[in-house]
């Protein structure tokens, strides 16, 4: 449940930042944008869109697609790095979940605030001692680096001169598009669905809400903005699916094997409870749990090798 709440808060924060940035560009009475954000971020992207649209004769729709692809390719390594860190921490947390079960059980059964606080402190200490991040390795730096690129292409797609009067495949880029809105909702739903693949059933039930948060948010934003911006989000949705496919079917399996190999070579130490009243019981249970998990993982690993040899 905590992971689900964390994901919802992170998505809400990302959307809030995006909405904040969309309001940073001022528009004069003539409908022309101005200000520091526009001059710094929007103008270079707008010039690039104009170059492809007019100087290369490709039209504004194709120009927005090309520039969006360029931007997304540039920031794709950052997105994958962010996914790698988050997935690595998630796999480590999944590995340690049985080891921390005695503490989690005390946390669930705590009858007083003091008992609950003591169990939470033990859990945080155990996670810290084993190099686990409380924030899942998400980190803000990759997101902050990506945001200027997102905002630049967003402003350029909306305010580049000539875009509002252009058409693309029968769509008026200066008007709202229900068609693009529906497609965008589907794309981001698929991306959310892919993110749940390979997740344990218990956690998947908790993450169900996340399958609808992003698509619904994108629908509200797409339906209220011109088709030129929706076209940018359409291409962004395709890249999000590509990134999620790489994360789910390439990164996660590799990281899962990496974590198992790490702790097979260097088994985690039994965590000793700081709770004097339950110190012996907790330590004994934790030690037994450690040994059982390590033995199980070694057995599974050897069985896999024998199967491959056979």
From Swiss-Prot:
**Gene Ontology cellular component?**
plasma membrane
Question: What GO terms in the biological process aspect are recorded for it?
Answer: protein insertion into membrane; protein transport
Which ranges are annotated Polar residues under compositional bias? Answer: 281-297
Q: Which PROSITE patterns match?
A: PROKAR_LIPOPROTEIN
Where located?
A: Cell membrane
Q: Which CDD domains match?
A: 5TM_YidC_Alb3 (cd20070)
Tell me the Pfam families matching this sequence.
Answer: 60KD_IMP (PF02096)
**Role noted for this protein:** Required for the insertion and/or proper folding and/or complex formation of integral membrane proteins into the membrane. Involved in integration of membrane proteins that insert both dependently and independently of the Sec translocase complex, as well as at least some lipoproteins.
Return the protein name. Answer: Membrane protein insertase YidC 2
Q: Which organism is it from?
A: Streptococcus agalactiae serotype III (strain NEM316)
Query: Gene encoding this chain?
Result: yidC2
